[in-house]
């Protein structure tokens, strides 16, 4: 069986091959997992190759939204989110799922119930985080992105779709929230005020899971769900979708940390 992660500049940088290879070995499953750099204009071509040769694949930046148009079906959650990070190939049909949303909900959902949540970003990861916050019962959600128009469009779309209080704020704007989620690739700057927050959630794990925002959270005594935690949880859910197994998350996390040299 063949699996992959596709995106921009993932070869040699994504920990997913190491993580899933270690997991497959521990489960006694004969499978290969590779990283494939796929330019946007070749996404359709890869989809046709995957349809005939792969059992499943993961999708990362910048294809989580674009890949949807090449799939045969979506899970209910992926359809609501408008983004896919996990694809199951079965009988030459490709079905999209969103295990990012599952991971955020599982690891942070308890903190988001009745809370004010700030989401940084407006791409595929932000969509997943936004859905998880809504599912958890967040009291109010703020969306903040460097391109203000994208934040406004995302907030409006989800506000109308789910009838929840969701507000876009300027990138330079300051707002304090109970839970802050970084769904951007920014790792080398403090991009939000964590004063008074109870939880910080970080999607970034490379070049290091100790991003500037993680360091700021630790300095302030804010609980952290880091990029490694999210990667492992979404990956475990992906394996459950692909193979119907319950993988050992400790094995997966150990492989990720070894890949990162930690």
From Swiss-Prot:
Pfam families: SDH_C, Shikimate_DH, Shikimate_dh_N
Statement: the UniProt record of this protein carries the keyword Amino-acid biosynthesis: yes
Catalytic reactions of this protein: shikimate + NADP(+) = 3-dehydroshikimate + NADPH + H(+)
Residues binding shikimate, per UniProt: 14-16, 60, 85, 100, 205
EC numbers on record: 1.1.1.25
Binding site for NADP(+): 121-125, 145-150, 203, 227
Enzyme class, UniProt record, top EC level: oxidoreductase
GO terms, molecular function: NADP binding; shikimate 3-dehydrogenase (NADP+) activity
Purpose: Involved in the biosynthesis of the chorismate, which leads to the biosynthesis of aromatic amino acids. Catalyzes the reversible NADPH linked reduction of 3-dehydroshikimate (DHSA) to yield shikimate (SA).
HAMAP family linked: Shikimate_DH_AroE (MF_00222)
Subunit structure: Homodimer.
Protein name: Shikimate dehydrogenase (NADP(+))
Organism of origin: Pyrobaculum aerophilum (strain ATCC 51768 / DSM 7523 / JCM 9630 / CIP 104966 / NBRC 100827 / IM2)
């Amino acid at each position: 069986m063949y699996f992959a992660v596709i995106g921009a500049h993932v070869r040699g940088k994504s920990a997913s091959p190491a993580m899933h290879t270690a997991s497959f070995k521990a489960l006694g499953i004969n499978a290969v997992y590779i990283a494939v750099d796929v330019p946007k204009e070749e996404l359709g071509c890869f989809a046709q190759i995957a349809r005939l040769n792969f059992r499943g694949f993961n999708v990362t930046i910048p294809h989580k939204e674009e890949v949807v148009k090449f799939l045969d079906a979506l899970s209910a959650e992926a359809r609501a989110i408008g983004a896919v990070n996990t694809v199951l190939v079965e009988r030459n049909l490709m079905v999209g799922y969103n295990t990012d949303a599952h991971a955020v909900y599982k690891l942070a959902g308890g903190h988001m119930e009745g809370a004010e949540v700030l989401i940084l970003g407006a791409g595929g990861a932000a969509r997943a985080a936004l859905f998880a916050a809504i599912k958890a019962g967040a009291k109010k959600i703020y969306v903040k992105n460097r391109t203000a128009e994208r934040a406004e469009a995302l907030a409006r779309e989800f506000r109308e779709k789910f009838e929840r209080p969701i507000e876009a704020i300027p990138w330079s704007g300051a707002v304090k929230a109970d839970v802050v989620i970084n769904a951007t690739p920014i790792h080398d700057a403090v991009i939000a005020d964590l004063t008074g927050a109870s939880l910080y959630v970080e999607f970034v794990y490379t070049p290091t899971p100790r991003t500037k925002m993680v360091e700021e959270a630790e300095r302030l005594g804010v609980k952290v769900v880091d990029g490694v935690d999210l990667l492992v949880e979404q990956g475990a859910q992906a394996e459950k979708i692909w193979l119907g197994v319950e993988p050992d998350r400790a094995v997966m996390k150990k492989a990720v940390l070894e890949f990162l040299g930690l």
